[in-house]
């Protein structure tokens, strides 16, 4: 089941206090980036973030976004300030994005 644009809009409202949030649609779901780092996504109308020490300190419910994927944490918080703090705390634990080489 693909995620709805309405649910994505709701998640983006929650992320309004997070700088440089971008999305990328992929196979009916949405990947979420902040400052170029992939930190989570919207999968089957569920807002999930990567599991890091910082995110595990706030969230407890693990869910698998799709078959074969690593478990992620369900964001069941509706307070935009809490969500912004959560994302800000987990970003330093994520790797820097890999730079793509240009084709010649």
Show which residues each predicted segment covers.
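Charge-dense, helix-prone N-terminal extensions
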Residues: 1-104
């Amino acid at each position: 089941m693909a995620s709805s644009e309405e649910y994505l809009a709701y998640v983006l409202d929650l992320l309004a206090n997070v700088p440089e949030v971008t999305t990328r649609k992929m196979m009916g779901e949405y990947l979420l980036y902040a400052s170029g780092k992939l930190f989570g996504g919207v999968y089957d109308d569920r807002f999930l973030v990567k599991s890091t020490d910082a995110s595990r300190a706030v969230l407890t419910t693990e869910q698998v976004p799709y078959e074969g994927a690593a478990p992620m944490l369900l964001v069941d918080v509706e307070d935009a300030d809490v969500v912004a703090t959560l994302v800000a705390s987990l970003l330093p634990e994520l790797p820097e994005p890999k730079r793509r080489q240009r084709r010649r």
